[in-house]
Amino acid sequence: MDFQTIQVMPWEYVLASQSLNNYQENHVRWSQSPDSHTFSVDLPGLRKEEIKVEIEDSIYLIIRTEATPMSPPDQPLKTFKRKFRLPESIDMIGISAGYEDGVLTVIVPKRIMTRRLIDPSDVPESLQLLARAA
């Protein structure tokens, strides 16, 4: 059986080339507090209209850039897209985003879980019998 030799491309050299990688990589910073998750990304030089924040299937947060008709035709398009899986315990209605001084900040609030104490005298007699039987 003959095996063909596969030539491996030196990707680290090609991708590190300045001509192919004109823009610095945008890193998304994530932090968590007791009340929310916060995503921050530096997107300098963009207008608010060029940034899209979307929720897909109530599971994923997508942050991306999109060229608009007002974008100067002589400028190369800068594209950015990141997709994050959201935890189940978030408040979908309370998600907010803001873009100021070239920094996009998306705040995803956590759903407030409250525990309710049940007074045994409030439990109907039929449920008390079921609890004892179990």
Curated annotation (Swiss-Prot):
<feature type="domain" description="sHSP">
    <location>
        <begin position="19"/>
        <end position="126"/>
    </location>
</feature>
<dbReference type="GO" id="GO:0005737">
    <property type="term" value="C:cytoplasm"/>
</dbReference>
<comment type="subunit">
    <text>May form oligomeric structures.</text>
</comment>
<dbReference type="InterPro" id="IPR031107">
    <property type="entry name" value="Small_HSP"/>
</dbReference>
<keyword id="KW-0963">Cytoplasm</keyword>
<dbReference type="InterPro" id="IPR002068">
    <property type="entry name" value="A-crystallin/Hsp20_dom"/>
</dbReference>
<dbReference type="InterPro" id="IPR008978">
    <property type="entry name" value="HSP20-like_chaperone"/>
</dbReference>
<dbReference type="Pfam" id="PF00011">
    <property type="entry name" value="HSP20"/>
</dbReference>
<protein>
    <recommendedName>
        <fullName>15.4 kDa class V heat shock protein</fullName>
    </recommendedName>
</protein>
<keyword id="KW-0346">Stress response</keyword>
<comment type="similarity">
    <text>Belongs to the small heat shock protein (HSP20) family.</text>
</comment>
